[in-house]
């Protein structure tokens, strides 16, 4: 059985991956630029791979996954739909994705600090997610 910090960190990463996948899926249909669509699709697939890895680890540890915070999910959905209705271009998509990734990096970094006793593999997985989200902010900058 994993220590409590490991379990909590993995659950938070699981919720974060779900939020990331859903957020990218919410905007993919509105993307016009082929390269931006490719960037987002590839990143979504990477999030899904990490999500599958997390799911497998959580199952082996006999732990349930965690859903994203309903309020955060609702606020994200509202912001996305309002902004896409108002402006609805690739720049808006890049802006929304950048904001979402920055929030993800901030939350994941907080979990690294909060769950100090988490096992190294859980910390490494969290860092991989941070790197993935940070890289996406870099990749979408030309579209801002």
Can you annotate each of these PLM segments?
Residues 1-7, 61, 84:
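Membrane-interacting alpha-helical segments
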Residues 5-13, 34-49, 90-96, 121-132:
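Alpha-helical scaffold segments that form or flank carboxylate-/histidine-based iron centers
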Residues 37-71, 140-143:
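Conserved alpha-helical segments that form or flank metal/cofactor-binding pockets of metalloenzymes
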Residues 21, 51, 55-58, 79-82, ...:
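A structural signal for well-ordered alpha-helices, especially hydrophobic packing surfaces
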Residues 25, 29-36, 59, 63, ...:
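Short, flexible helix-adjacent loops and helix caps
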Residues 2-31, 92-116:
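Alpha-helical bundle segments that constitute or directly flank the non-heme di-iron/ferroxidase center
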Residues 56-105:
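Carboxylate-rich helix-loop segments that flank metal/cofactor sites and access channels
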């Amino acid at each position: 059985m994993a220590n409590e910090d490991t379990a909590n960190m993995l659950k938070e990463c699981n919720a974060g991956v779900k939020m990331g996948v859903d957020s990218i899926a919410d905007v993919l249909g509105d993307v016009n630029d082929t390269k931006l669509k490719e960037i987002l699709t590839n990143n979504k697939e990477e999030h899904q791979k990490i999500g599958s890895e997390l799911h497998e680890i959580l199952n082996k540890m006999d732990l349930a996954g965690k859903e994203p915070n309903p309020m955060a999910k609702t606020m994200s959905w509202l912001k996305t739909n309002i902004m896409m209705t108002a402006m609805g271009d690739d720049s808006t998509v890049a802006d929304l994705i950048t904001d979402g990734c920055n929030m993800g990096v901030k939350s994941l970094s907080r979990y690294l600090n909060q769950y100090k006793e988490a096992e190294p593999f859980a910390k490494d997985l969290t860092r991989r997610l941070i790197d993935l989200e940070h890289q996406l902010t870099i990749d979408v900058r030309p579209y801002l």
